[in-house]
Amino acid sequence: MGCWGRNRGRLLCMLLLTFMFMVLEVVVSRVTASLAMLSDSFHMLSDVLALVVALVAERFARRTHATQKNTFGWIRAEVMGALVNAIFLTGLCFAILLEAVERFIEPHEMQQPLVVLSVGVAGLLVNVLGLCLFHHHSGEGQGAGHGHSHGHGHGHLAKGARKAGRAGGEAGAPPGRAPDQEPDQEETNTLVANTSNSNGLKADQAEPEKLRSDDPVDVQVNGNLIQESDSLESEDNRAGQLNMRGVFLHVLGDALGSVIVVVNALVFYFSWKGCTEDDFCVNPCFPDPCKSSVELMNSTQAPMHEAGPCWVLYLDPTLCIIMVCILLYTTYPLLKESALILLQTVPKQIDIKHLVKELRDVEGVEEVHELHVWQLAGSRIIATAHIKCEDPASYMQVAKTIKDVFHNHGIHATTIQPEFASVGSKSSVVPCELACRTQCALKQCCGTRPQVHSGKEAEKAPTVSISCLELSENLEKKPRRTKAEGSVPAVVIEIKNVPNKQPESSL
């Protein structure tokens, strides 16, 4: 709350100063015909929008409590705000670039350079104040570190655990750390209940219609209620750095624009020799100087003066293009990082091949598939995986080892769906013991499409598309013998449901 109060005060102060100065720069740029000041005023307008977006994102990001509608809260609001800020800044850069190209074709002489100089100095002071307010958000790489402060957790009950809760029993969760070690607790969810553990997750017996989507969800891990801790607040603060970094880049762009305005005004004031009202003067820098000089020579024999040098007029758009390149160079990393987070790509610090290798090397793990790793915000990295094990008896020890593997890679919010090998099955033959039905197989994250063969292999390879569930359903049906099959002995496969041998898993 303290960090939110500090950021909110800084944003409001900078928003007020930026809006007032934007209005001043728009008026002065129109009066003095200064492209640098006009582009800086447009950038100020972008800053006003960016600060408003940052305020809204900060406000929503404070709502970290999970609800039934937003199970992760609004923690990604700041990432969205950073992306919007980066898009605003990129669009503004292209607008300034087009204006600079137009000034190269039709150069304009600056009017009242001293006024432009004074306004540019004042704008530079305002932007320096903004840089002082947001300097601690200048270059912090988000999500690149491995933070060991945890405390955010939520449990997902398996169907078997919920049934046990309704019957009056207590369904156990994977054993975690002791209550005094709660700040270092990981968020690890398994879809198998350990009925031997008496200190487990309790099933929620509240009626569904009494629960609203905006009500916060109380989370219990190992029977203990997880509260907002200092470590969780530090996670939120790291998640908010991306949004504040976007604000810093806007202020930095304003400072560069103010420097360009000051330099351009100084060079124009000391180097440009313009025409006065009393003298006959020709400006060779404009597109058609011949016509005006011929008319002047025909009308009078007075001495002619020439304005210049012309390179001063091209300094303004040249400096604007340099500013655009600097802004695009500083904005691209922010745009890329926020976009990749929203696209849920694997974080750059996670070596997914090495992670899969370590998981498969764990004793008791036969196969790993459907592994997904993405970044929620800041340093919060989430992973889900299907782990195929030998038997349920050794699974809890395997789950602890898997949790340590994820922890070593900086992943502290994990959901593991266990799969236990059927009798006589091999991982290479049946890679997934809980396969999806054919109508939803292509809608999975990975999409279990049949392998495509080419050439002669396509003619030899039969097309088989059947799931584990459909295979079990077909085997349960009694085979019907036709007349043509009278001489062929029937093979009946009976599947006996052995209760309490394998816990029920929920997809």
UniProtKB/Swiss-Prot annotation:
It holds the Pfam family Cation_efflux. Residues 145-156 are annotated as: 6 X 2 AA approximate repeats of H-G. Residues 32-35, 100-113, 269-307 are extracellular. Widely expressed. Detected in duodenum and jejunum but not in ileum and colon (at protein level). Expressed by neuroglial cells (at protein level). It is found in: Cell membrane; Basolateral cell membrane; Cytoplasmic vesicle membrane; Cytoplasm. It catalyses: Zn(2+)(in) + 2 H(+)(out) = Zn(2+)(out) + 2 H(+)(in). Residues 1-10, 57-78, 135-247, 329-507 are cytoplasmic. Residues 140-218 are annotated as: Disordered. It is a multi-pass membrane protein. The modification Phosphoserine is found at S506. Residues 204-215 have a biased composition (Basic and acidic residues). Residues 147-165 have a biased composition (Basic residues). Gene3D superfamilies: Cation efflux protein transmembrane domain. PANTHER family: FI23527P1, PROTON-COUPLED ZINC ANTIPORTER SLC30A1. Zinc ion:proton antiporter that could function at the plasma membrane mediating zinc efflux from cells against its electrochemical gradient protecting them from intracellular zinc accumulation and toxicity. Alternatively, could prevent the transport to the plasma membrane of CACNB2, the L-type calcium channels regulatory subunit, through a yet to be defined mechanism. By modulating the expression of these channels at the plasma membrane, could prevent calcium and zinc influx into cells. By the same mechanism, could also prevent L-type calcium channels-mediated heavy metal influx into cells. This is Proton-coupled zinc antiporter SLC30A1. It comes from Rattus norvegicus. The gene is Slc30a1.
